[in-house]
Amino acid sequence: MVVAPAHCLRVISWNLLHGQAIPPVPNQEWTQTLISATTQMAVNYQPDFISIQEVDYLQPRSNNINQTKVIAENSGLKYWAYLPAIFGTPGESWKKVKNLEQSIITENSDIPESKSYGIGIATNQKIIKLSVKKLGRSIIGMPLLIPKDNGKGARFIYVKDEPRVALVAQLENGLTIATTHLSFVPGVNIFQLNRLSSFLKKLPGEKILTGDLNLPANIPSKLSGFKSLAKIPTYPSWGEKIQFDYIMARSSSVKSGQISATLIENNSKLNISDHSPIGVEIRFQ
């Protein structure tokens, strides 16, 4: 049962690209750039719940900050949680996280740890339980398109896949919301999506699945038992043509009218990340 104040909830999903300015700029002021983009996002979306991916924690490349905490504080959201997918830095040296449950960092346990990279959430709704789900990784990498350093055009680089995880928050209002960042390797991401959706179906309350699923053309709605609540391109941020980022609810809840949603328009460019945020206002019957 969903209870007040969650009869209406504004949910955002945002692949952060660790706060990288787009186009890239020399000597980026990482903390201030993230604060500025977050403040702009919060004014535009007025979120109750933010799902974030490609988040840094104490990384030298992004000014050694806890990006999840910075986003929560500058969005006016009291509760937050961060789950590392790896210790180290993607694309460089890293190792897998052996105990995901013990590696969660929240507003009540923000202690110095090794630098890491992963996913996070921030919300104004009290969190009563956090769960994690390992989703595995691809043994092969893929060429990915990234912006050129001079900000003009894009280039391909070969990227190895890293372990994929999901962070699931059960809220006091009865909702269960998951965030994840699935593999960019075709087929592997479908396997991960099905693994996560099966896990979520066993949890209590209405379930919302969010994140960068790396699947275009509304494929997640066709395969997972969850239905996308907004169809809008989110990638690349400098000229969106493909939807990789989703906010989804159980297909049965959407079909029965228990859940409906309205897209929140993105009225401004945030000037960070190669993904644009996606936001919906969800209504619960």
Locations of regions flagged by a protein language model:
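Metal-dependent phosphoester-hydrolase catalytic domains
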Residues: 129-134, 185-208, 213-285
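Surface-exposed cleft-lining segments at the edges of enzyme active sites
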Residues: 22-27, 55-56, 137-157, 179-186
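Residue-level detector of structured alpha->beta connecting loops
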Residues: 46, 76, 124-126, 204
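Beta-strand-turn-beta hairpins that frame and shape the catalytic cleft
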Residues: 3-12, 119-133, 142-146, 160-179, ...
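Active-site flanking residues adjacent to catalytic metal/cofactor-binding acidic residues
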Residues: 14, 53, 180, 210-212
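Short, P/G- and charge-enriched loop/turn segments at secondary-structure junctions
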Residues: 104-111, 153-157, 232-236, 264-269
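Alpha-helix-centered segments that form part of catalytic cores
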Residues: 112-118, 152-165
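N-terminal, active-site-proximal structural segment of metallo-dependent hydrolase catalytic domains
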Residues: 1-116, 190, 194, 274, ...
